[in-house]
Amino acid sequence: MNESEDNEMQIIITGGGGFLGQKLARALLQGPHPFTELLLVDIQQPQSPLPDPRVRCLRADLTEPGVADSLISERTAVVYHLAAIVSSHAEQDFDLGWKVNLDTTRTLLEACRHARPGIRFVFTSSLAVYGGPLPELVNDGTALTPTSSYGAQKAMGELLVNDYSRKGFVDGLVLRLPTICVRP
């Protein structure tokens, strides 16, 4: 990026209307991070967690052709890909689970690849990639043995991020999160 592009830095959060997306957006807005636009994208209209002119909220279906390409540009610095169908829903609706949890990940990676190399791509995975009970110590050598469609989708998403990173298309980071239950 050149200096003028640095002044036009965009951060995108998919799943920006969800629990994690809102927490992340708030942290970014309150932090020292230099950006000109924080784009919150969700299947339902997201809201900004704080009043800030840098925030743009967009209702969009990332499974629709062309949507990812319309969001990501040369000024995109970071994509936080938090959008997903949760485990039970991915089991109940096999096709939708694959479409949202894997196909959308690849579509976003492709949009980053074509916009410019090196966009930071943060993918939220899940401990479901390990399947049943976890060993006492989980490290990089722990085998991925998903026992659900959701776990398989997240494991394949991780492999995609790793491969796109290896090729220099994105600067990928995978975060394996535990189950997060949000209740009022």
Language model regions located:
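SDR active-site strand-loop-helix element
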Residues: T14, V41, V79-A83, F121-L127, ...
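Conserved cofactor-binding/catalytic machinery of classical short-chain dehydrogenase/reductase
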Residues: E64, V78, T104-T107, T142, ...
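N-terminal Rossmann NAD(P)H-binding glycine-rich loop of SDR-like oxidoreductase domains
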Residues: Q10-P34
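NAD(P)H-binding glycine-rich loop region in Rossmannoid oxidoreductase-like domains
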Residues: L62-V100
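Active-site Tyr-X1-5-Lys
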Residues: G132, T147-L173
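Conserved Rossmann-fold NAD(P)-dependent oxidoreductase catalytic core, especially the SDR/UDP-sugar
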Residues: R106-S148
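Rossmann-fold cofactor-recognition segment
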Residues: D52-E64
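Glycine-rich NAD(P)-binding loop of the Rossmann-fold in SDR/ketoreductase-type enzymes
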Residues: Q92, L96-T107, L144, A152-Q153
